[in-house]
Amino acid sequence: MLMISPRMASGMQEKQYTPSLLSFFIYNPKFGPREGEEEKKILFYHPIEIEKNEKIRNVGLCEAIVQFTRTFCPTKPAKSLHTQKNRQFFHEPEENYWMVMVVRNPMVEKPNKDGKPPTVEYQEEEIIDSVYGSVLQQCYSMYKLFNGTFSRAFEAGGVELLTQKLEKFFYRYLQTLHLQSCDLLDVFGGISFFPLDKMTYLKIQSFVNRVEESLSLVKYTAFLYNDQLIWSGLEQDDMRILYKYLTTSLFPRHTEPELAGRDSPLRPEVAGNLLHYGRFLTGPANLKDPEAKFRFPRIFVNTEDSCEELHLIVYKAMSAAVCFMINASVDLNREFCEKLDSLVGPQLTLLASDICEQYNINRRISGPEKEPQFKFIYFNHMNLAEKSTIHMRKMASVSLTSVHPDLMKILGDINCDFARVDEDEEIIVKAMTDYWVVGKKSDQRELYVILNQKNANLIEVNEEVKRLCATQFNNIFFLD
């Protein structure tokens, strides 16, 4: 992506280029071990128009780097390679299957006088390994969610089936990568949980139990409100990648005007006739259509153990969405979908209205939101809970931040420092822009705070962070 900043005098402008994807490929060195068979190793290569010999050369170089680094650390070969112009990231998700992502470093093009070519300055220090390494791991996790493992496809149909699946999935998925907006949240890959009072939570639990009892085919259920998770029957790692798919891909494609609470004219009470705002986000677009298709996307969970293949039914009413997962061997027909719609639609509509009403009451009690003097990111490694006042997710796949990229870079650097040690610790940084950045790591939890108080000293900054912990995280213990 190109950004132009008018820093130069006399009408001359600098051009700033953000990180971008140069290439992405997957190979298995066991598939072409002999000379002259090197092309057989390559299972997928983007961009597709790259000449064959260049593909073979690039894959061969990556093989050599991996083998060379294995001599120093057999269990942990290369994770990344730094060059002036780009950075390469390596990931071996399954034995002998290697994924490589090459990212062009950000750069600034400075114009020269007298008609000389512009001077290019590469800003390789702006790229954080942990962020883009996590993006590469997400690529595999998302593929595995919809296709199962690489080895599963190979066992089912050999190299031909595997390459077909890789091309079909990654051709579309790579277009959704927005490398210029990747940051600390990609490292965490967390889940945003919706805050609820106990009574409303019990209503949701009761609703899930009733539906699972009435629709015995349902194996797992997940309940979300306002793109935040409330209930899940899936394992954490499966839910975290399904959550990412729902919130960055499926839900943004089906945005709708928010419907208000029970006292809204949009939801009149009609005696003896429960209101029904429910609809399928996956599967049939309209149940009344005689030509409706009853095909649902399939997902794979518990791939480390039994590897279950499931139908994914996502059903939504107002701001509430429920995911029903059913064994893929079951044939889902019109009768089942109509039963689900008539059972879930009215109940979910009522429940969504109740949640909205309760949420609005709680907001009125807590008073109007003021613009705080601090912004923060919180992550809990134990339950994957994530909370950020820095990010404003408004578009599919794109994470917009409300702070300067330099501050996001500092957050990433602090996180890298935390990852190097197991002990709890705290880091305080004074940025060049006079902002204070604080990182706290305590008992599997991480908190990052950005303070806009340029005249504050270390003691005052520490007190401010303590106040934040007391107001925002009063039930969480952070070591001082």
Curated annotation (Swiss-Prot):
Tagged with keyword Isomerase: no
Record-level GO BP terms: vesicle-mediated transport
UniProtKB keywords: Lysosome, Membrane
Pfam families recorded: Intu_longin_1, Intu_longin_2, Intu_longin_3
GO cellular-component term (any): intracellular membrane-bounded organelle
Cellular localization per UniProt: Lysosome membrane
Protein family (similarity comment): Belongs to the CCZ1 family.
Protein name per its UniProtKB record: Vacuolar fusion protein CCZ1 homolog
Organism field: Danio rerio
